[in-house]
Amino acid sequence: METLLHSEILKKYKEETNEYIKKKNVEKLFDIILKNVLINKPDNIYLYIYNNIYSFLLNKIFIMGPPVLKITSMLSSHISEFFNYYHISLPILIQQYKLNKGESSNNKIIVNDEIISFILKENIHNLDSKKKKGYIVEGYPNNNLQAYSCLKYLPSHVFVLYADEEYIYKKYEEENDIAIFSYTQKKDYDINEPHEINNIDVKPLKDQVLSYIRNISDMLTILGTNKKVLNLHDFNDQMLIDHVKNEVSKNKDEWDSTLNGDI
């Protein structure tokens, strides 16, 4: 009789414990804590966890897309406003850094990956993780080194907005109400080849676009299963916003039961 009673008590205890573990997301919580500790290797592990536990649970969203186009900024703004998340615009932060360093037309400031990493880390560190449930990083990552660094933040989502050269140039012209290229059919490759038609220096534009095209394949490999590739040919602006909203909504409340007091 005692053995049977003990068995029933033990069974009930296991059921309640498993239910608690599932409801409070305990396994994922400890997995995230462990990963953050191993990535950052703090001297005082207890203080590190105590001071940063809320930041571990933020919905961390990175959005990178074609240079010179407005789509990445527009999407980041809409998502941050809709979910009331922090919005970190890396292009703006880099521009502010250059201005603070006294950049001018005769004095160009080079911002390397180390500086970009520092700027981003500092801004994320300064967020009040108790006030909002997540943040959006606009315009990151942009190359292989940045992709590796991005993974260290244990991102919830990395949205990669993909477009080919022709799309980027045509969209740029549309957004800026300007015609700087003509598109003629190239028979050998059956693609449209842009040719300059105005006396405008488009070299900086072309350099940025070519850098994006050159880096994106390797970045996608590095990001692995963490990224979601969205081909801009398949979306208009509103469709893109709605799609990303739906993706972010899937896990926006996943830590509510962990942080709430009810059992």
Curated annotation (Swiss-Prot):
GO molecular function: adenylate kinase activity; nucleoside triphosphate adenylate kinase activity
Compartment(s): Cytoplasm
Any one biological process term the GO annotation gives: nucleoside triphosphate biosynthetic process
InterPro entries cross-referenced by the UniProt entry: P-loop_NTPase
Key words, A-Z: Cytoplasm
Record bears the keyword Cytoplasm: yes
Top-level lineage group: Eukaryota
Claim: Cell inner membrane is one of the keywords in the record: no
Gene3D superfamilies xrefs: P-loop containing nucleotide triphosphate hydrolases
One annotated Gene Ontology cellular component of this protein: cytosol
Family: Belongs to the adenylate kinase family.
Summary of the function given for this chain in its UniProt record: Lacks adenylate kinase activity.
Protein's name in the database: Inactive adenylate kinase
Organism field: Plasmodium falciparum (isolate 3D7)
Protein encoded by which gene: AKLP2
